[in-house]
């Protein structure tokens, strides 16, 4: 054995080095949060639960262009529309199968009027599979519930679009 190794062994230098690291780590600030009681900060680009937005006058934003349905790689979106008296289209059915959805965000990017968005809600577990089949009413309710946050997130992300 080399003399330096004997010296380290006698004076427990390897042990003291490890102990030094452990003591430093004890006094560092904690990185974890106490999850259901504390929530971490969410990015404005977070892809959570889907929502359909309305204009400030209460009219639905969706113009039934079906771009989101066409671009969805998982084919999770189904849209049906009818024609209004003035010639424009109205969405009669807007369904998203959340079991198929891969949360890629392509539907949100393709929408020309920011009608379909992915909101900040990540706590939407259910007890049955049927609850993961979102219809137009459920999506509009989500949009109404999260409108303030959604509008702020879109405004914050506007420079990156």
From Swiss-Prot:
One of its GO terms (biological process) is aerobic respiration. It comes from the Bacteria. [4Fe-4S] cluster 2 binds at residues 72, 101, 104, 107. It is an enzyme of class 7 (translocase). [4Fe-4S] cluster 1 binds at residues 62, 65, 68, 111. It catalyses: a quinone + NADH + 5 H(+)(in) = a quinol + NAD(+) + 4 H(+)(out). It is found in: Cell inner membrane. Transmembrane segments: none annotated. GO terms for cellular component: plasma membrane. NDH-1 is composed of 14 different subunits. Subunits NuoA, H, J, K, L, M, N constitute the membrane sector of the complex. NDH-1 shuttles electrons from NADH, via FMN and iron-sulfur (Fe-S) centers, to quinones in the respiratory chain. The immediate electron acceptor for the enzyme in this species is believed to be ubiquinone. Couples the redox reaction to proton translocation (for every two electrons transferred, four hydrogen ions are translocated across the cytoplasmic membrane), and thus conserves the redox energy in a proton gradient. PANTHER family: NADH DEHYDROGENASE [UBIQUINONE] IRON-SULFUR PROTEIN 8, MITOCHONDRIAL (PTHR10849:SF20), NADH DEHYDROGENASE UBIQUINONE IRON-SULFUR PROTEIN 8, MITOCHONDRIAL (PTHR10849). Belongs to the complex I 23 kDa subunit family. This is NADH-quinone oxidoreductase subunit I. The lineage of its organism: Bacteria, Pseudomonadati, Pseudomonadota, Alphaproteobacteria, Candidatus Pelagibacterales. The gene is nuoI.
